[in-house]
Amino acid sequence: MQPGGQPDMSALLAQAQQVQQQLMEAQEALANAEVNGQAGGGLVQVTMRGSGEVVAVRIDPKVVDPSDVETLQDLIVGAVADAAKQVTILAHDRLGPLAGGMGGLGLPGM
């Protein structure tokens, strides 16, 4: 704080730039992180990057039944949804603390 209770703008700018850099690094790490989703007790597993890209699908041969394709389709959709949920949780865990740091820049009302 400067005299008169005003925030030191150069210090605020430096802090904001530091938080921005940390956020960019965390976003890059998140985009490259991989999570696993599953359905059917692990019969179908999906690996997804934090960017949302599906990089692997593993299907247990026990669930492959040509006369019941719908079940396999449902399991794949469920595994992708589970992986997407895991990405959301990971993003919250990794980016949440940085977003919370934005409020501590010393500006009134933040």
Curated annotation (Swiss-Prot):
Gene3D superfamilies: Nucleoid-associated protein YbaB-like domain (3.30.1310.10). Binds to DNA and alters its conformation. May be involved in regulation of gene expression, nucleoid organization and DNA protection. Signal peptide: none annotated. GO terms for cellular component: bacterial nucleoid; cytosol. It comes from Mycolicibacterium vanbaalenii (strain DSM 7251 / JCM 13017 / BCRC 16820 / KCTC 9966 / NRRL B-24157 / PYR-1) (Mycobacterium vanbaalenii). It is found in: Cytoplasm, Nucleoid. PANTHER family: NUCLEOID-ASSOCIATED PROTEIN YBAB. Homodimer. Keywords: Cytoplasm, DNA-binding. This is Nucleoid-associated protein Mvan_5528. Its main location: cytoplasm. InterPro entries: YbaB-like_sf, YbaB/EbfC. Belongs to the YbaB/EbfC family. GO terms for molecular function: DNA binding.
